[in-house]
Swiss-Prot record:
NCBIfam families, alphabetized: lpxK (TIGR00682)
Annotated catalysed reactions: a lipid A disaccharide + ATP = a lipid IVA + ADP + H(+)
Alphabetized GO MF terms: ATP binding; tetraacyldisaccharide 4'-kinase activity
Functional description taken from the UniProt entry: Transfers the gamma-phosphate of ATP to the 4'-position of a tetraacyldisaccharide 1-phosphate intermediate (termed DS-1-P) to form tetraacyldisaccharide 1,4'-bis-phosphate (lipid IVA).
Full protein name: Tetraacyldisaccharide 4'-kinase
Keywords assigned by UniProt, alphabetized: ATP-binding, Kinase, Lipid A biosynthesis, Lipid biosynthesis, Lipid metabolism, Nucleotide-binding, Transferase
Length: 342
């Protein structure tokens, strides 16, 4: 095991269970906690002003750092609202893209280097207009200027970006819940666990195991899981059932916040890939990590696939997934909340 992998696993264990390293970092977490509280108080008492869009804003975010399954939820929300008569658009920070000038607005097939991995994936999956900028209020203004027909904005991963006023907050968490309950760096949280009592809804990504979730009083709570649909070859778009790969020599790779979740999704489809490459989140694939992989097929995430076309590796297959909710009334609940906003 490399030194980097050792420290990464140690940190993840400490974030889940606590321990000596978490205790050592606890004073820094107290400073982060104070900074977070002061920021929220500044917006609450009017010392800082949030920009309010002329249309409703729905934030989909989390308090646990890293991947919890937000992107499939954003896709489901965009598609669900469109099916209910809305014209939705999305704003995002555009993580990984260097945006130093005005916001970037696009639709359809977008360059992940210019828009970021998640916005490019969501735009391709839904066809919804997207705008990206570190200042999400500017992104929202640019989105509405370019697409005045938009009547609801979905803010991807914007829970802590208080400069953009919001009407509905949805938190996506996974089976890790709130971990050891501490803020960064002693724990995995961006905000205190009590923040969950203030949001409108909590969606827990169960994956294939039992959830250990925080108990909250105010929020509606749904469970979700990712259902694997089929595989799409990256080089030519050919689709094939996942069952067709059973019995073949297959591998898997994921450059996302929680690679293990992707590997378990494949297992739920009856596949046992080996090797399994856990790549860094937002891995850019400027160099192929697959040269030494001996496999007939290599499964990758849809987010990684948008960056892998240039590799021209016919073994690469993107696994298409769909967010399923424990109660199908989630999107109806969201529709009703939007229609009853003041």
């Amino acid at each position: 095991m490399s030194l980097n992998n050792y420290w990464s696993r140690l940190l993840q264990t400490q974030w889940r269970d606590g321990g000596w390293l978490s205790r050592l970092l606890h004073p820094l977490s107290r400073l982060v906690d104070r900074s977070v509280r002061l920021k929220r108080e500044a917006y609450r008492d009017g010392r800082k002003q949030a920009w309010r869009a002329p249309v409703p804003v729905v934030v989909v975010g989390n308090i646990y750092v890293g991947g919890t399954g937000k992107t499939p939820v954003v896709v489901a929300v965009l598609e669900g609202l469109r099916a209910r008569g809305y014209t939705p658009g999305m704003v995002s920070r555009g993580y990984g893209a260097r945006i130093q000038g005005p916001p970037r607005v696009g639709q359809g097939q977008l360059d992940p280097a210019a828009f970021g991995d998640e916005p490019a994936l969501i735009a391709a999956a839904t066809g919804a207009p997207v705008a990206v900028h570190p200042r999400r209020a500017l992104a929202a203004q640019a989105l509405l200027a370019a697409h005045p027909e938009i009547d609801v904005i979905i803010a991807d991963d914007g829970l802590q970006h208080l400069a953009l006023a919001r009407d509905i907050e949805i938190v996506v968490q996974d089976e890790r819940g709130t971990g050891n309950g501490l803020l960064l760096p002693a724990g995995p949280l961006r905000e205190p666990p009590a923040r969950l009592n203030e949001v409108d809804a909590i969606i827990t990504n169960l994956n294939t195991g039992p959830a250990q979730v925080a108990q909250t009083g105010a929020a509606r709570h749904w469970a979700m899981w990712l259902e694997p649909l089929d595989a799409q070859r990256v080089t030519d778009g050919k689709r094939q059932a996942l069952s067709a790969f059973r019995g073949k020599k297959i591998a898997a790779a994921a450059g996302i916040g929680n690679p293990g979740r992707f590997f378990r999704t494949l297992e739920s489809a009856g596949l046992s890939p080996s090797p399994r490459l856990a790549l860094p989140d937002h891995y850019d694939f400027s160099r192929s990590p697959f040269h030494d992989v001996r496999a007939e097929a290599i499964f990758i995430t849809a987010k990684d696939a948008i960056k892998c076309a240039r590799l021209k590796d016919t073994r690469l297959w993107s696994v298409q997934v769909r967010a399923c909710f424990s109660d199908p009334d989630f999107l109806d609940w969201l529709d009703a909340r939007l229609r009853n906003l003041p």
